[in-house]
A protein has these predicted regions:
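Short, charged alpha-helical segments
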Residues: 107, 118-129
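Short amphipathic alpha-helical molecular recognition features
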Residues: 22-25, 57, 104, 115
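Alpha-helical substrate-binding/gating segment
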Residues: 8-52
């Protein structure tokens, strides 16, 4: 539960959970989300009642994100950990099926891009900015590796 930034802070602290039913992240940077809202409000093409969703077309498994933080910001010396398993055994037994279902998800942003002209930030840029903010502003403590 909660925004993905909270989950990143738990990764930095070395104590994060597996996503429910092994759902990957499809993150959109909050700055891009805000830009989409503003551009849609300013648009004369949006009709009353139309719905738009800003999806990420990149899917990230939660267990790969912690390692990605270490690759993007080696200077913080993050101790890469595995997520805590939160699923009951009956769901753990179906992990491969759940992951296959999520891999088949075909999320697209063509409508949003066409309407707003937005270019979405890469997940690497969003993740790096998020981690740096969590450390510098929120004071998140990083579980560091012993090297």
């Amino acid at each position: 539960y909660g925004p993905w930034q909270r989950h990143v802070s738990t990764m930095l602290e070395g104590n994060y959970e597996q996503n429910w039913v092994y759902r990957p992240w499809f993150p959109v940077d909050v700055r891009d989300n805000a830009s989409c809202h503003i551009r849609m409000l300013e648009s004369t093409k949006v009709k009353n009642g139309e719905r738009y969703i800003a999806w990420s077309t990149e899917a990230w498994n939660v267990e790969s994100i912690c390692a990605r933080i270490d690759e993007l910001l080696p200077e913080i010396r993050l101790q890469v950990t595995e997520p805590r398993e939160v699923h009951p055994e009956r769901l753990q037994a179906r992990e491969s099926r759940y992951r296959a279902l999520w891999r088949a998800a075909d999320l697209r942003n063509e409508r949003m891009v066409e309407l707003t002209g937005i270019t979405f930030r890469s997940f690497d840029d969003s993740l790096r900015d998020c981690v740096e903010s969590l450390i510098a502003i929120a004071g998140t403590e990083v579980l560091t590796s012993a090297d």
